[in-house]
Regions:
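Active-site glycine- and acidic-residue-rich loops that bind
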Residues: 102-113, 140-152
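Binuclear metal-ion centers of metallo-dependent hydrolases, dominated by the metallo-beta-lactamase
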Residues: 55-74, 121-122, 141-145, 150-208
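A short acidic, amphipathic alpha-helical/loop segment
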Residues: 24-29, 53, 111-117, 158
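Active-site metal-binding motif and surrounding structural segment of the metallo-beta-lactamase
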Residues: 2-42, 117-142
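Short internal beta-strands
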Residues: 36-47, 165-168
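Active-site environment of divalent metal-dependent phosphoester hydrolases
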Residues: 16-21, 47-50, 68-71, 86-87, ...
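Core dinuclear metal-dependent hydrolase active-site scaffold
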Residues: 1-6, 63-130
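Metal-dependent catalytic neighborhoods of phosphoester/phosphodiester hydrolases
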Residues: 22-32, 49-53, 178-184
Length: 208
């Protein structure tokens, strides 16, 4: 982690859930983060909980508004896309490509149109980063099946919506540790299920 931080300029936090935001991490590595003048990018929120915590550690924080573009240099920029009260995605533009990271967001059609309007240069290819399985509680087996199917179909939907040149599925290797929760894993999508679905739908992808 220290080696990574010594070669890091920015840290993006999508939202405050513990699989995306670690209080322990920032407390433990705050001195290294400050020494390297790492800028933390986060969304403006009404409760300001994350904002106030990071400021209490005297870290360099840049708050972004919904659809606000933050430019790193002439060829690289990031645009934050809020969803609901807590979550966010981002659109990262480079010289040749757009990188759309959906994170944990579930955008409705109107929101997808709004994101699409942010893509100004139609000559650039778009790479999509997206979940491929559910990662939260579902009360019935039937609901688990539907949640798993929804995640796969959503990949196809977003790929078609944005005419993606490449899909990078990620962020779905969850594990419920308590014995009472073992059935929740029964219908989760694994890499083999995902690979078969993407190939059957002629979607170009990269599994890391």
């Amino acid at each position: 982690i220290v080696n990574t931080l010594n070669n890091t300029n920015y840290i993006f936090i999508s939202h405050e859930h513990p699989d995306h935001f670690s209080i322990k991490f920032f407390k433990e590595y705050k001195d290294i983060i400050k020494r390297n003048n790492i800028i933390i990018l986060f969304q403006e929120t009404e409760d300001k909980r994350v904002e106030n915590f990071l400021k209490s550690l005297e870290l360099n924080l840049k708050l972004l508004k919904h659809k606000e573009e933050f430019r790193f240099d002439p060829n690289n920029s990031i645009t934050l896309i809020k969803q609901g009260h807590i979550d966010s995605a981002f659109l990262y533009e480079t010289k040749n490509n757009y990188h759309l990271n959906i994170n944990d967001c579930n955008f409705i059609d109107n929101e997808l149109k709004e994101i699409k309007s942010l893509i100004k240069d139609k000559s650039k290819k778009l790479i999509l980063y997206i979940q491929f399985s559910y990662a939260s509680f579902r009360p019935t087996e039937e609901w688990l099946k539907k949640a798993a199917t929804y995640k796969l179909n959503n990949i196809k939907k977003l790929s078609n919506t944005f005419n993606c040149s490449l899909i990078v599925p990620y962020a779905s290797f969850f594990y419920f540790s308590h014995e009472e929760n073992q059935d929740l894993k029964k219908w989760s999508n694994n890499c083999n299920t995902l690979k078969k679905y993407l190939e059957n739908n002629n979607l170009r992808f990269c599994l890391l």
